[in-house]
From Swiss-Prot:
Species in which this protein is naturally found: Streptomyces avermitilis (strain ATCC 31267 / DSM 46492 / JCM 5070 / NBRC 14893 / NCIMB 12804 / NRRL 8165 / MA-4680)
Family: Belongs to the ClpX chaperone family.
Protein's UniProt name: ATP-dependent Clp protease ATP-binding subunit ClpX
Binding site for Zn(2+): 13, 16, 35, 38
Chain positions recorded as ATP binding sites: 123-130
Residue ranges of domain ClpX-type ZB in the record: 1-54
Name of the encoding gene: clpX
PANTHER family found in the cross-reference section: ATP-DEPENDENT CLP PROTEASE ATP-BINDING SUBUNIT CLPX-LIKE, MITOCHONDRIAL, ATP-DEPENDENT CLP PROTEASE ATP-BINDING SUBUNIT CLPX-LIKE, MITOCHONDRIAL-RELATED
HAMAP family: ClpX (MF_00175)
Record-linked Gene3D superfamilies: 1.10.8.60, ClpX chaperone, C4-type zinc finger domain, P-loop containing nucleotide triphosphate hydrolases
Keyword terms: ATP-binding, Chaperone, Metal-binding, Nucleotide-binding, Zinc
Length: 428
């Protein structure tokens, strides 16, 4: 058996060009050589590709209770919505699993399971988008967010509905097979309600027209998607994607829908036997809890569209206590994020309870919900985030209620003469 280098020639790796003296091992093939470093690199590339193309492992599909508990770690409150989403998502991917495995039934006996697309009602900043994002993160499936207000019917200025699918394909790194089991969240769907309950004789290209265009992809169809987005034209290739197993979560604030619900419920509650509720009871109750498909049709959604969203659930306005929990309790809570940012500069950041209450009150006053908390935190911490990184004498920053209410400077606690902060112990 011939040994490498017997002829006296200095052999090199055919891939990186390094000589046998520069590497640990040089493996010979028919007319080629590869070094141990190139082998390691090839293994890393293969592992990355396998990780990227890994699909949901259906045999390990989490149960509804496990999905709910995962959501609990990121989303505060909204128990009813989390429970409904957990069940709907589990049933959807169980349906996908049954479709891939044949469900253990012959083709003649097979029962076709319908899709469980979800309609999520609730005010802005109440956690609709976060719920959808968290579900996708747990299941390790591609996730895309689309804004319904940018969509128009095909042939008019604006985005075609197929561009929603392109975002999902891009999220899956153009792995169409993987994208076909992803989740799409369409926000602001209430903004495409038709102008009146009755069908219009004029073209409503950004309202009813969008709902009509969404029907097919919601139900399940093979759509042709332009790979670069934009409008379709005959001289381009298309990506074919089957939306049968794509889960659609459709959300919107539906401002004014509560009045339609009240008027319907009020018509049934007239007379001596009617249940009378105080204003306080009505405010504390989830305003969309009693929603019916007929209310959504009166709001301006077409019946065919509502029919393709069998799971209807809602999130409610966040009160002060819920906002306080959002600030400190979730795994990626805002207070924890800012404390980590200051920690990277070697500084502790503390919030007094009254300061957190003041931040929550500001969010309620601005009617921005949880989404507005970060903006308020940025305003409160802007001056100290500008000042502290340049100062080596600051050990701790304390945020009080006056900092939030009156825009006074935060309390800066200096280090001692040896450079220790007040909470640091002397080491032997």
């Amino acid at each position: 058996m011939a040994r490498i280098g017997d002829g006296g020639d200095l052999l090199k790796c055919s891939f990186c060009g390094k000589s046998q003296k520069q590497v640990k091992k040089l493996i010979a093939g028919p007319g080629v050589y590869i070094c141990d470093e190139c082998i390691d690199l090839c293994n890393e590339i293969i592992e990355e590709e396998l990780a990227e193309t890994s699909e949901v492992r259906w045999e390990e599909l989490p149960k509804p209770r496990e999905i709910y508990e995962f959501l609990e770690g990121y989303v505060v409150g909204q128990e009813a919505a989390k429970k409904a989403l957990s069940v709907a998502v589990y049933n959807h991917y169980k349906r996908v699993q049954a479709g891939e495995n044949g469900g253990g039934q012959s083709r003649e006996d097979a029962i076709e399971l319908a899709k469980s697309n979800i309609l999520l009602l609730g005010p802005t900043g109440s956690g609709k988008t976060l719920l959808a994002q968290t579900l996708a993160r747990m299941l390790n499936v591609p996730f895309a967010i689309a804004d319904a207000t940018a969509l128009t019917e095909a042939g008019y200025v604006g985005e075609d509905v197929e561009n929603i699918l392109l975002k999902l394909i891009q999220a899956a790194d153009y792995d169409v097979k993987k994208a076909e089991t992803g989740i799409i969240y369409i926000d602001e769907i209430d903004k495409v309600a038709r102008k009146s309950e009755n069908p219009s004789i004029t073209r409503d290209v950004s309202g009813e027209g969008v709902q009509q265009a969404l029907l097919k992809i919601l139900e399940g169809t093979t759509a042709s998607v332009p790979p670069q987005g934009g409008r379709k034209h005959p001289h381009q290739e298309f990506i074919q994607i089957d939306t049968t197993n794509v889960l659609f979560i459709v959300g919107g604030a539906f401002a004014g829908l509560e009045k339609l619900i009240e008027s319907r419920a009020g018509a049934k509650g007239i007379g001596f036997g009617a249940t009378i509720r105080s204003k306080r009871e009505l405010e504390s109750k989830d305003q969309f809890e009693d929603v019916m498909p007929e209310d959504l049709v009166k709001f301006g959604m077409i019946p065919e569209f509502i029919g393709r969203l069998p799971v209807i659930t809602s999130v409610h306005n966040l009160d002060r206590e819920a906002l306080l929990q959002i600030l400190v309790e979730p795994r990626n809570a805002l207070v924890k994020q800012y404390q980590r940012l200051f920690e990277l500069d070697g500084v502790e950041l503390d919030f007094e309870r009254e300061a957190l209450e003041a931040i929550a009150d500001q969010a309620i006053l601005r009617q921005t919900g949880a989404r507005g908390l970060r903006a308020i935190m940025e305003e409160v911490l802007m001056s100290v985030m500008y000042e502290v990184p340049s100062r080596k004498d600051v050990a701790r920053v304390v945020i009080t209620a006056d900092v939030v209410h009156s825009n006074v400077n935060p309390t800066l606690i200096p280090r001692d003469a040896r450079g220790r902060g007040p909470g640091e112990q002397k080491t032997a």
